[in-house]
Amino acid sequence: SARMGYMILELNNIDKSFGEKEVLKGVSFTAEGGKAFGLLGRNGAGKTTSIRIIMNVFPASGGEVLLDGKPIDYNKIGLGYLPEERGLYPKKLVIDQLAYFAELKGMGAKEAVRAVDYWLNRLGMTEYRNKRLDTLSKGNQQKIQLITALAHNPHIVILDEPFSGLDPVNAMLLKDVVKEQISQGKIVLFSSHQMAYIEEFCDSIAILSAGRV
């Protein structure tokens, strides 16, 4: 039973095929706002495909994705995504990249810069504001990706292997940030092949294996 006012994301019986290859076979799970949901599975189990369907990158072949019982209106619902493949524009300045993405997600220019500066400060990254992305360490690039996912204050936050490549200090910081997002009532979905993180964080778990839960 969901708590009042929190959103519920449901995948009902999702199938996905690419040509002859069946990747997802009747995948169903429910993720609630204000809780962390973990999607656990080996590489190739269908985690990324499930995420891409939630994000509307491509449609499911069958089944439905619902938010509060209705199809998701992607113009109204903000999604934040930290991909496992960390893609950045190397020659851009940190502030330009981040403000660009926040504006892309519907923020006004001033609002975007304000939000980005808040997050740079929150993650101890203010000194890198006017640096080029390709001058940053891997861990700091990952923090930039996290800001890209969170600056526009999304309703649904999807974190794909968020702790891989982080040193202990940054891992702790990320954990704090994620707990904060959960306490704000957001739907936070973790995807990982590492049980330890999922167990530590998540209130409920779906284990994907060969395209099934």
What are these regions (language model features)?
Residues A99, E103, K110-Y128:
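Conserved ABC ATPase "signature" region
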Residues V157-D160:
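Catalytic Walker B motif of ABC-type/P-loop ATPase nucleotide-binding domains
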Residues R132-L136:
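Conserved ABC ATPase signature
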Residues I198-E200:
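A short, surface-exposed alpha-helical micro-motif characterized by mixed small hydrophobic
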Residues G63-I77:
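Conserved ABC transporter NBD signature motif
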